[in-house]
Amino acid sequence: MRKITQEACRAFENAQNYKKSNTKVVRINEVSAEMYLHGNLIAYSDESGIFISNGGWSSNTTKERLNGLTGVNIRQVNYRWYLNGDFWNGGWIRISD
């Protein structure tokens, strides 16, 4: 995992602001944050959990950033993404605890 991914995911999971290169985490409040990649929202958290999306881009960088989050395991087989073993079209989904 790249250092930028580790730093961004740590900031996201601790609801702290972070900005480096193409990745930004915005603290909303003490329990909520949003993660952006190239200006596209790819993850947000609130009191009900963590939600992810590919932001419309099935790129290796998007996959890498999301895979840095706790509870996320995205794999690609024949250009199709699988989230925690199940096919995923990249739309918004809540990550189970």
Where are these regions (language model features)?
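Terminal leader/tail segments of proteins
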Residues: M1-D97
